[in-house]
């Protein structure tokens, strides 16, 4: 317990820092409807959009794509369809996006997303998480 008798709160004023965060599930798989992100951005009053693209079959498709062309290996629909239709409004409203669309080529996905933002005349911060590719040691 903290000094206010609340369980779980950490430090003075911890309860005052709590705020509601609205998360919209924009996709559940590669090939999911492109309407989800559009509807969530237009009507969902969301703080975050989450796109889940990866499954075992998808990973094998992306690995094969990367073998043919190292510039791919990510879920291209994320950039070319999903983000293209909502990017400007996402930036204007300060909605944050979390996605695993980078697949086996997260840097390539990030580059494509930055290029899309530039083509739409919007500034976009993009972060990439990588380091889980075990193929070099297999």
Regions found by a protein language model. Give the residues of each.
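Residue-identity detector for glycine
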Residues: 3-13
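Metallocofactor- and cofactor-centric catalytic cores in central/energy metabolism, strongly enriched
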Residues: 2, 15-138
């Amino acid at each position: 317990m903290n000094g206010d008798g609340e369980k779980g709160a950490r430090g003075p004023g911890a309860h005052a820092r709590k705020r509601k965060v609205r998360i919209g599930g924009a996709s559940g798989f590669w090939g999911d409807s492109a309407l989800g992100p559009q509807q969530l951005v237009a009507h969902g009053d969301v703080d975050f959009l989450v796109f889940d693209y990866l499954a075992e079959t998808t990973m094998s498709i992306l690995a094969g794509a990367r073998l043919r062309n190292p510039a791919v290996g990510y879920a291209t629909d994320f950039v070319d369809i999903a983000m293209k239709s909502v990017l400007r409004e996402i930036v204007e409203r300060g909605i944050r996006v979390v996605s695993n669309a980078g697949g086996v080529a997260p840097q390539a996905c990030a580059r494509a997303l930055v290029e899309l933002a530039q083509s739409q005349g919007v500034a976009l911060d993009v972060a990439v998480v990588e380091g889980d590719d075990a193929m070099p040691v297999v």
